[in-house]
Amino acid sequence: MFSCFNNLGLDYCYQCMHGPEGCMVPSRQGDGGELYAHSEELEAKLRGLAKKESLEIEKSLENDKKTYGSHIKILILGGPSSGKSTIFKQMQIIHSNGFKTEQELIQYRGLIDTNIRQTYRQLVSGARVVGISLESLESLVHDINKVYAPMAADEFSIRTIPDVVEPLTAFWNSREIQEVYKRRYEFELLDSTKYYLENLNRISKSDYLPNEEDIVHSRKATVSINSIVFQYTGVSLLMVDVGGQRSERKKWLHLFDDAKVVIFVIDLTGYAKKSEESRTELSRFPNFFNEIGNDAFDMKVALKIFNDVAGSHALANAVFLLFFNKVDLFKELLPQVSLQPCFSKFAEENSYDNTSKFICDKFIRAAKPKKSVFPHFTTATNTENIKMVFRACMESVFKANSKATGLS
């Protein structure tokens, strides 16, 4: 059973490029024993994919150079579902034109419709995982499924929210689903679930077009290279998000050896989650599997990725900005889930101050001793927070050693 087909109804797996019969990405429910059943074949495919992606990245960077000329390059990297693309969208809102054209707004309206449909399906599935019966909601589920059942999970060409707003609102407000939501760390669920489902009446209006807050809460897997150029205090910055690159980083990271700054984003709630994306990360890199096992918490995977990236020769001269993201969700989760299962050496009270300091220290120690690393705690969906943090970050970067940054 492979989750990319069960949950999304896809013809091929975007993670390993196989069809249903040959997919190598195990479902969360599997024991992981099949993880490397076809490792040689997977590695061969990834080598070809890495070469293709390297050429695509190189072409994209060359086009940027021709178009924008000289600039300081900022690379966005990070752990699974950490908010990399959300940070990128915030930069577009704060420092560029944002999202204002009718075409952009209509596209995001469709994506938001899709995200709401995904959250509904995830909540129904999550109820089974945590053992909460939805029998009393059978009528509501039936009414919602009449609209949603014929549609693929990622289909957003048809607007459906106006047709389900009443039963979906009742579904969300039910005692059973609120109990399921409290245990959301036990199954896959979009971070934007609460935000969207509490705004259904507004989103369902016939003249609805998303605002910037709606847009930054939207979620779509990054499958391409995105870049943006903007001016900051008279300096031209090129920000590149390569979150959609699925092949081994060492095979394309050298293309960014001129990056002056790396923003590495960490999902703080990852200490309590073992997501499909983490398992996919492990399936691509056997050395990760050997070091931390196939059932690692997302934060352990992020820590290993950071250790790998921070030690890369290609980024030896880059300043690293650590964005410990989703502070708001992290604070909500702390009373329910201890940090100790993820980090066995943590033995203090599970307070925000204690846990955030412990996590921050873990990541800073994972970098080389002389590496310039500046930690910041963020809520990527909060535009004012990101504006303030980015200002502080750039002040740190501009003050950093001129040999390391090349910015003096």
Swiss-Prot record:
Residues 378-383 are annotated as: G5 motif. Residues 70-408 form the G-alpha domain. One of its GO terms (molecular function) is G protein-coupled receptor binding. Mg(2+) binds at S85, T222. GTP binds at residues 38-45, 78-85, 201-205, 216-222, 241-245, 285-288, 325-328, 380. Residues 321-328 are annotated as: G4 motif. G proteins are composed of 3 units; alpha, beta and gamma. The alpha chain contains the guanine nucleotide binding site. This is Guanine nucleotide-binding protein alpha-14 subunit. It comes from Caenorhabditis briggsae.
